[in-house]
């Protein structure tokens, strides 16, 4: 939870309701209100609802619940003459900027909003840092984000004399806290005017030149960081909340100096999330319709359309909490009100039993053992160089490069096993069943889990027929009369491989391993391999039950 302190009278004035009503509506948004004194309240907000970290963001959400405003908020957006040139900044390579004109906002609240974003999406400024400047005091319409030497001088925020960046790191609290994040090789990231004057050294401190005051209504906002997505989301969150305070958003041209590519910032990107009516009914246990679902989505300040019977929700980028379908369902529950969802007693007379997939996998393992194969078990993680497809899940910051990817097939693991057991008595017959993660563009993540089984034989002399016979036996024992269609790929010898089909559905692959692949794995003997797609087999067998 993230805690913010707001003036309750200013907040209530934005939405024209009483305090008890405010508390009830915030409870629906998974937030709690605690009074501090006569004028101020403390609000605990879920850490994923970054758009609610200011009074204007809260007001926007509550206006939707009150049906004073429905759907995504519309803001005044205009082009400006301002340009941000992004140079090659090695420690924090991404930057975007925007202008906001005539926003009527409490300065203390704006600073609180900025720091709460630093602590959440910004990961204490390590991932994202925000600079907010008084536009009146920015002299140049061309701003550059670049590396500067530590000898650069400027007056830091609330300072009264020029200091070098080195001195700022040594003498200021911000320098001591955040200097180690971005300083490297004797240079610092900096936001600089075209005359060379420094406006800020993110993520450390702004220049005193563009300090905000009570009369500031026009803002220049820069966001820098290590993740482009987080930078774009953060900027959208800030400018949309300032626009709720009456501001007009000004676009800034962003030029990447290395390749001259141009963006118009803020990006205001949206995501389309499809929602199934039956899924909503199942999760919430309610009777509803597509139209009613769309109404609740609109109350949660997102746009919703029904196209060809499909509910399409348009998610604004500042709603960083909406990752997939279940998050939209949660928003629908908030719109309905948790207190309005009727609890029902769940009565079950079912007895525990094995999942069908577990039983099928057990059967396949028993058949493999019965066919004379020894079961092995490899890690789900693997070295990416061993994979045959470039569509796989890469591990960020792996503990070791030997396990830097998630396997998308069982075949590389079997080949790796064979390469390490060439000294064993021949023939070697092994198999494995287990999970892989395969590419699937139809899913939210672009990948899905798949259950598979793979079989391998290595001997002084071995051919396609040696593996085809036991595989056919296993599939026939499962009740599948399959056929084999010649199909070449980079794993097997051309003309000595096939795909396994049942009623035009691919159930697996089989073939003699290509000598180039054997050399790649350091295998000196011929090998044959088959891989069965258990998930697909399960679908077919389930349909036959």
UniProtKB/Swiss-Prot annotation:
Q: What is its EC number?
A: 6.1.1.20
Cellular compartments per GO CC: phenylalanine-tRNA ligase complex
Instruction: Name the residues that bind Mg(2+).
Output: 321, 327, 330-331
> What GO molecular-function term can you cite, just one?
RNA binding
Cofactors required: Mg(2+)
| GO biological process terms held by the UniProt record | phenylalanyl-tRNA aminoacylation
Q: Which reaction does it catalyse?
A: tRNA(Phe) + L-phenylalanine + ATP = L-phenylalanyl-tRNA(Phe) + AMP + diphosphate + H(+)
Q: Which residues form the B5 domain?
A: 268-343
SUPFAM superfamilies named among the record's database cross-references: Class II aaRS and biotin synthetases, Putative DNA-binding domain
Alphabetical UniProt keywords? Aminoacyl-tRNA synthetase, ATP-binding, Cytoplasm, Ligase, Magnesium, Metal-binding, Nucleotide-binding, Protein biosynthesis
- Where is it mostly found? cytoplasm
How is the subunit organization of this protein annotated in UniProt?
A: Tetramer of two alpha and two beta subunits.
Q: Which NCBIfam families match?
A: pheT_arch (TIGR00471)
Family classification: Belongs to the phenylalanyl-tRNA synthetase beta subunit family. Type 2 subfamily.
What is the name listed in the Swiss-Prot or TrEMBL entry for this protein?
A: Phenylalanine--tRNA ligase beta subunit
Species assigned in the record:
Saccharolobus islandicus (strain L.S.2.15 / Lassen #1)
Its lineage opens with: Archaea, Thermoproteota, Thermoprotei, Sulfolobales, Sulfolobaceae
Q: Which gene encodes it?
A: pheT
């Amino acid at each position: 939870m993230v805690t913010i302190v707001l003036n309750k009278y200013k907040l209530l004035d934005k939405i024209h309701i009483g305090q008890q009503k405010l508390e009830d509506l915030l409870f629906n948004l998974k937030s709690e209100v605690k009074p501090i004194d006569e004028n101020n309240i403390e609000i605990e907000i879920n850490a994923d609802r970054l758009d609610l970290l200011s009074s204007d963001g809260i007001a926007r959400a509550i206006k939707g619940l009150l049906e004073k405003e429905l759907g995504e908020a519309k803001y005044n957006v205009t082009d400006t003459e301002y340009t941000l040139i992004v140079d090659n900044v090695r420690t924090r390579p991404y930057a975007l900027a925007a202008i906001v004109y005539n926003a009527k906002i409490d300065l203390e609240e704006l600073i609180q909003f900025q720091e709460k974003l630093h602590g959440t999406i910004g990961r204490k400024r390590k991932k994202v840092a925000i600079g907010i400047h008084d536009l009146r005091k920015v002299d140049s319409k061309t701003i550059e984000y670049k590396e500067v030497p530590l000898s650069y001088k400027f007056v830091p925020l609330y300072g009264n004399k020029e200091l070098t960046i080195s001195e700022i790191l040594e003498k200021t609290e911000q320098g001591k806290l955040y200097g180690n994040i971005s300083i490297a090789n004797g240079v610092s990231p900096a936001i600089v005017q075209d005359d060379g004057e420094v406006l800020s050294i993110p993520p450390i401190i702004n220049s005193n030149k563009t300090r905000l005051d009570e009369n500031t209504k026009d803002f220049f906002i820069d966001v820098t960081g290590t993740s482009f997505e987080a930078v774009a989301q953060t900027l959208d969150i800030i400018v949309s909340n300032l626009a709720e305070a009456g501001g007009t958003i000004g676009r800034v041209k962003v030029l990447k100096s290395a390749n001259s590519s141009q963006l118009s910032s803020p990006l205001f990107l949206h995501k389309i999330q499809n929602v199934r009516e039956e899924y909503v009914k199942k999760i919430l246990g309610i009777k509803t319709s597509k139209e009613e679902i769309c109404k609740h989505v609109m109350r949660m300040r997102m746009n919703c359309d029904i196209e060809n019977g499909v509910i399409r929700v348009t998610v604004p980028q500042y709603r960083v909490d909406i990752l997939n379908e279940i998050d939209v369902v949660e928003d629908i529950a908030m719109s309905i009100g948790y207190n309005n969802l009727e609890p029902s007693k769940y009565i079950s007379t079912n007895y525990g039993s094995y999942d069908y997939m577990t039983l099928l996998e057990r059967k396949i393992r028993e058949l493999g053992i019965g066919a004379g194969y020894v079961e092995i078990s490899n890690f789900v993680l693997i070295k990416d160089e061993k994979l045959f497809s470039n569509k796989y899940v890469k591990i960020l910051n792996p503990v070791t490069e030997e396990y830097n990817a998630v396997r998308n097939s069982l075949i590389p693991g079997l080949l790796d096993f064979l390469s390490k057991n060439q000294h064993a008595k021949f023939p070697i017959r092994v198999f494995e069943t287990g999970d892989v993660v395969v590419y699937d563009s139809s899913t939210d993540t672009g990948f899905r889990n798949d259950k598979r089984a793979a079989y391998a034989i290595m001997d002084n002399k071995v051919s396609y027929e040696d593996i085809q016979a036991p595989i056919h036996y296993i599939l026939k024992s499962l009740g599948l009369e399959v056929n084999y269609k010649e199909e070449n790929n980079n794993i097997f010898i051309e003309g000595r491989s096939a795909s396994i089909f049942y009623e035009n559905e691919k159930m697996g692959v089989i073939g003699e391993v290509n000598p180039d692949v054997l050399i790649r794995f350091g295998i000196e003997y011929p090998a044959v391999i088959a891989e069965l797609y258990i998930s697909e087999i399960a679908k077919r067998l389930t349909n036959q039950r």
